[in-house]
């Protein structure tokens, strides 16, 4: 059996080169505030991979994505070991674009903090009088740069995203920046509407895109997982305060309340975290993991 070593290790994912494709493995690691925590969250990698698969299938009519298969039988023998089952995705190779495409449909988190001070979120002027967690009149696109592990992503304007892409792809910056913005908002609207019908509010999320060999923009990375999105229960939703969530916000809140924890979570927080991830998966897909 041929051994494979990751060519890249992110905060949560490991990427393996499979010749004309890549194999992306979602581990059970969890990160918060750009730090990898000491604990593993059992089954988390499976939730991320299967949730992404669901959304990639759901949005394929809107634009192509990089997913080829999540069946380890389609992958080399090395990936048929138990630790890869359910949490591995074979993907097309793309040239990834260095812009994190964030879309916000509700005002919360850092966006709410910024709005209270300036009336703006990432430089975008919003109407007066919005409450915390309120739905925005229209989703807003707030891109950021992609940071290395340990660094913080930096918010940029749409205009700055043109400059970032123009430097890498002369003559194409505006075209690519516009596609990223328009695809991001279209994907969010389609998926947020579906999620609402299943009892979940997608408050915000981020997408990442790449280029195929012909220069077409393709959706990559993960899609609408509890790691990349804020999911709130529709039941009991009321603007004016923070919302309970099915995502990493639960972990962030615990860390904020326990600043001396040294990023070491107690077992009950780990158990509640995976329960929330699995509940979100079941509500959205109608299936158990």
Model-derived features with residue positions:
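Active-site loop/lid in soluble adenylation, ligation, and acyl-transfer enzymes
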Residues: 1-148, 261-289
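Coil-to-beta-strand transition motifs
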Residues: 21, 96-98, 198-202, 214-217
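Intrinsically disordered, low-complexity acidic/polar segments
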Residues: 33, 112-113, 214, 228-230
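Surface-exposed helix-capping loop/turn segments at secondary-structure junctions
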Residues: 60-66, 190-202, 215, 285-289
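Conserved metal-phosphate-binding beta-hairpin within the catalytic cores
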Residues: 103, 202-223
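Anionic ligand-binding catalytic core segments
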Residues: 117-120, 126-175, 219, 223-284
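A long amphipathic alpha-helix within ATP-dependent nucleotide-binding catalytic cores
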Residues: 169-203
